């Protein structure tokens, strides 16, 4: 199963890239986590970021695999345990669906990205830096995969 991660931002710090790469490398062989980095929209000084979010939205929507379940990360989204996340993955696998996880940039996400989401998912009630959210999501997807596979990484 392919897991798609679409994230606004590029030129991440080395420690972000290393953390993300570590969980991708550890992912079980039948699960692949593929990252698509979206170039941030140009933000005009003094503007509210709406135009930048619209540009990013067009790039995000173009990057999503056709037919994928769009899972948009949002601080107001559904909170879930890792076991619940594993259940979502199992259901999507059983239905032959590709989940496309979307992480917005510094200005958040345009409503058009959220509107078509199959699920709004909150990693935390805390507001997380978008770069760090990549690493946390990769770890949680790895942990969920371990639950599905019966690997002892996750302990209740």
Swiss-Prot record:
InterPro entries: Alpha/beta_knot_MTases, RlmH-like, tRNA_m1G_MTases_N
Catalytic function, reaction form: pseudouridine(1915) in 23S rRNA + S-adenosyl-L-methionine = N(3)-methylpseudouridine(1915) in 23S rRNA + S-adenosyl-L-homocysteine + H(+)
Enzyme Commission number(s): 2.1.1.177
Hydrolase recorded as keyword: no
Cited SUPFAM superfamilies: alpha/beta knot
Keywords noted in UniProt: Cytoplasm, Methyltransferase, rRNA processing, S-adenosyl-L-methionine, Transferase
PANTHER family from the UniProt entry: METHYLTRANSFERASE (PTHR33603), RIBOSOMAL RNA LARGE SUBUNIT METHYLTRANSFERASE H (PTHR33603:SF1)
Self-association state and partner proteins as the record states: Homodimer.
Similarity field: Belongs to the RNA methyltransferase RlmH family.
Listed name of the protein: Ribosomal RNA large subunit methyltransferase H
Biological source species: Thiobacillus denitrificans (strain ATCC 25259 / T1)
Lineage: Bacteria, Pseudomonadati, Pseudomonadota, Betaproteobacteria, Nitrosomonadales
